[in-house]
């Protein structure tokens, strides 16, 4: 059974091919109109202006050919559904029109064989152009019609059977080349579509830099694994009571503004966005690409999120809107990571396990401890002396038999970073 990602790829590829067929149909019709316009102008000049009867005989049929070409272009613009079948116009319009014009030219030409040979070149060009339809059936139909028209002209020109068969072989070779070109175009479109979908899927979870590295490593489909990571949960304080005072569209606007700012901070520190849980944010560091500094990045991200919230609140205050407060919990430990969900409907690359649960519990403790950020001992030990730490009283959390040691971090000042002593 094809999974959801596979169906999405196939559906997107089908839409991409249909869109490309539409663009190619319009471009091909414009090329035909310009080409027929140029030849019609030449025919009018030599036939009507210069009075050359051998050119004047072409003017009425070529004017009719030009009119049909122009009407075809107009129809493609007005009726988009016709673009999918635009390749048939090569077989139903161009091939018969060229045969008609050359049929008229045969009695007037001193070299009927030359007329038939020139027509062979025109038909070969049409076959190659039919590859732009991105449909092999169209190319084969154009080739068959061109072969019939070319053989008929050569018979009228009294050219030998061997030459007629050779002409068919030449047109067949052109068809083979056109089909190969068509295959290459479809392959390139498929590859480009798959890469774009892969980039879009990765971009949902990972920062642009991480997504690019994963794509270079061809790791869009990550395998399940147990890995040490740093989990971060962020939650808006008193969001329920705040949302009850707002209209639905205001709630959505608030969350979009808040999440937009916070996700940029997360990605700036190389974090992986796991999910939005109402007004909460779940992020982890150190996966899917290993990062020995995941604890430090997680703590710095938490500090920068609190700082970014000050910018958000300044904008909200200027608009007369209430300020927001957040609580952030950070914990480091082993977690199971992989694509979890329905293989036929929806899969999400996520982290599960006790580490995730404890990180969420630590975030909840920020409400009772009245601090914006709390981190576990494991995170504090791995992040090291990059930050200053204040140890809080251990806290009891559901699911743990022993109280959990928690710390609140803050950035060092420039003087402290230079090595000056500072109080913890």
Swiss-Prot record:
Top-level taxon: Bacteria
GO aspect biological process, one term: intracellular signal transduction
Domain (Guanylate cyclase) ranges: 230-363
EC number annotated for this UniProt entry: 4.6.1.1
Reactions that this protein is recorded to catalyse: ATP = 3',5'-cyclic AMP + diphosphate
CDD domains, per the entry: CHD
Activity control summary: Inhibited by adenosine. Activated by GTP.
Family: Belongs to the adenylyl cyclase class-3 family.
The protein's name: Adenylate cyclase 1
Biological source species: Stigmatella aurantiaca
Source species taxonomy: Bacteria, Pseudomonadati, Myxococcota, Myxococcia, Myxococcales
Gene this chain is encoded by: cyaA
């Amino acid at each position: 059974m094809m999974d959801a990602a596979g169906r999405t790829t196939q559906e997107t590829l089908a839409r991409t091919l249909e869109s490309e067929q539409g663009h190619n149909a319009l471009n091909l019709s414009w090329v035909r109109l310009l080409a027929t316009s140029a030849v019609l102008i030449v025919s009018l000049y030599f036939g009507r202006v210069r009075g050359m009867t051998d050119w004047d005989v072409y003017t009425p049929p070529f004017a009719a050919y030009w009119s049909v070409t122009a009407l075809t272009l107009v129809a493609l613009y007005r009726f988009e559904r016709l673009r999918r079948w635009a390749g048939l116009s090569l077989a139903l319009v161009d091939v018969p029109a060229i045969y008609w014009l050359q049929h008229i030219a045969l009695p007037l030409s001193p070299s009927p064989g030359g007329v038939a040979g020139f027509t062979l070149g025109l038909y070969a060009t049409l076959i190659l152009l039919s590859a732009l339809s991105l449909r092999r059936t169209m190319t084969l139909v154009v080739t068959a019609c061109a072969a019939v028209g070319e053989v008929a002209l050569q018979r009228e020109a009294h050219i030998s059977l061997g030459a007629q068969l050779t002409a068919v072989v030449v047109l067949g070779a052109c068809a083979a080349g056109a089909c190969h070109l068509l295959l290459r175009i479809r392959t390139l479109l498929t590859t480009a579509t798959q890469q774009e979908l892969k980039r879009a899927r990765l971009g949902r979870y990972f920062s642009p830099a991480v997504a690019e590295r994963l794509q270079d490593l061809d790791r869009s489909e990550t395998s399940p694994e147990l890995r040490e990571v740093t989990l971060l949960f962020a939650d808006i304080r008193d969001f329920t009571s705040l949302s009850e005072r707002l209209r639905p569209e205001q709630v959505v606007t608030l969350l979009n503004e808040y999440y937009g700012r916070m996700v940029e901070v997360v990605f700036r520190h190389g974090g992986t966005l796991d999910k939005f849980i109402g007004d909460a944010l779940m992020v982890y560091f150190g996966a899917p690409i290993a990062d020995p500094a995941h604890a430090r990045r997680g703590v710095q991200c938490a500090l920068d999120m609190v700082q970014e919230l000050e910018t958000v609140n300044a904008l909200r205050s200027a608009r007369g809107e209430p300020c927001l407060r957040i609580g952030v919990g950070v914990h480091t430990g082993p977690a199971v990571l992989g694509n979890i969900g329905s293989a036929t409907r929806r899969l999400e690359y996520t982290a599960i396990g006790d580490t995730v649960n404890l990180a969420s519990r630590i975030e909840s403790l920020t409400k009772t401890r009245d601090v914006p950020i709390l981190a576990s001992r494991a995170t504090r030990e791995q992040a090291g002396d990059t930050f200053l730490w204040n140890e809080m009283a251990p806290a009891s959390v559901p699911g743990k038999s022993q109280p959990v040691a928690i710390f609140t971090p803050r950035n060092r000042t420039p003087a402290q970073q230079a090595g000056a002593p500072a109080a913890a």
